[in-house]
């Protein structure tokens, strides 16, 4: 753990993908709550993919697509303003395909929000296609809205950490918790098979390795408390053989599950690992994925 001076990261504007599906509408209203909580603007984005469609679609159809998209954005903005009349809401109709459009709208400081299911077809925000593409490739935080509207708040944000390198994005999770006036729970899963594999039986000090993990997680919690002295921060190391299973279970006891996204192998291709992949499909609460390339002020000395 380094001794750099840490500062609180700022939470940026909220950018939500709108495609007309019930899931996207739920995500838009969730994003409005998030933007209001942050004191930031909300951007409603529909990426109509008209540049690509124009290769095989006539101009009249393209115009109809644009008009339908404008109506969709206006209707969504109206629904948001009914609940948050003072929230600054901007509508954007983009010509790109959804993954590129959402990334462009987010810039380098925004947070992208998507629903957990889409309509299918060109404009869908379906996990497995667009939603997964955004979560895997975006260089800004991405929140996949999961869980039911009727679910009561727990007053906690959970961060799933691995090691000391997670500090930068962990401070963003702390900022999320503070904005919600919630506690931050730092959880690390100690899976001996995943960490030392088939040589586990040959190691004499597995308990010592586990204690080292506990020490690292405690050190992370201490650094967070330095930056957020008023924040309630708990930390826990869970032992088990299924990291996704443990975190999915934990998602039922928290309002937001936050995790980092590793660097891409050789610098190319998507980098969404199996744990994140499982969580955004099966979590019982919204999941926030923060890429390692997202440099917060907290990571600068």
Feature locations, PLM:
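Glycine-rich, Arg-bearing micro-motifs that act as flexible, cationic patches
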Residues: 114-133, 154, 242, 256-282, ...
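Short, structured interface segments
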Residues: 130-149
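General small-molecule cofactor/ligand-binding pocket signal
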Residues: 43-45, 90-94, 143, 185-187, ...
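Structural beta-alpha unit
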Residues: 1-10, 23, 60-63, 79-112, ...
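Conserved N-terminal glycine/acidic-rich loop preference
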Residues: 25, 33-36, 42-44, 66-73, ...
């Amino acid at each position: 753990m380094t001794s750099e001076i840490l500062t609180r990261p700022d939470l940026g504007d909220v950018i939500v993908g709108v495609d007309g599906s019930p899931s996207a509408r739920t995500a838009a209203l969730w994003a409005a709550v998030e933007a209001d909580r942050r004191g930031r603007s909300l951007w409603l984005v529909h990426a109509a993919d008209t540049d690509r469609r124009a290769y095989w679609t006539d101009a009249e159809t393209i115009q109809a697509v644009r008009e339908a998209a404008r109506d969709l954005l206006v209707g969504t903005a109206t629904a948001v303003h009914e609940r948050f009349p003072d929230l600054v809401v901007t509508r954007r109709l983009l010509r790109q395909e959804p993954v590129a459009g959402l990334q462009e709208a987010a810039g380098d400081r925004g947070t992208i929000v998507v629903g957990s299911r889409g309509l299918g077809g060109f404009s869908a925000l379906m996990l497995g296609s667009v939603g997964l593409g955004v979560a895997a490739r975006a260089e800004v935080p991405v929140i996949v809205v999961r869980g039911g509207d009727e679910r009561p708040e727990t007053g906690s944000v959970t961060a799933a950490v691995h090691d000391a390198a997670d500090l930068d994005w962990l401070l963003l999770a702390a900022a999320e918790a503070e904005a919600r006036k919630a506690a931050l729970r730092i959880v690390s899963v100690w899976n001996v098979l995943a960490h030392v594999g088939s040589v586990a039986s040959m190691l004499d000090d597995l308990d010592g390795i586990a204690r080292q993990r506990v020490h690292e997680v405690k050190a992370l919690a201490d650094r967070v408390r330095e930056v957020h002295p008023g924040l309630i921060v708990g930390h826990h190391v869970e032992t088990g053989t299924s990291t996704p299973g443990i975190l999915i279970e934990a998602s039922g006891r928290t309002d937001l599950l936050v995790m980092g996204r590793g660097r891409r192998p050789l610098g190319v291709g998507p980098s969404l690992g199996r744990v994140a992949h499982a969580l955004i499909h099966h979590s019982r609460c919204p999941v926030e994925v923060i890429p390692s390339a997202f440099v917060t002020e907290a990571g600068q000395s």
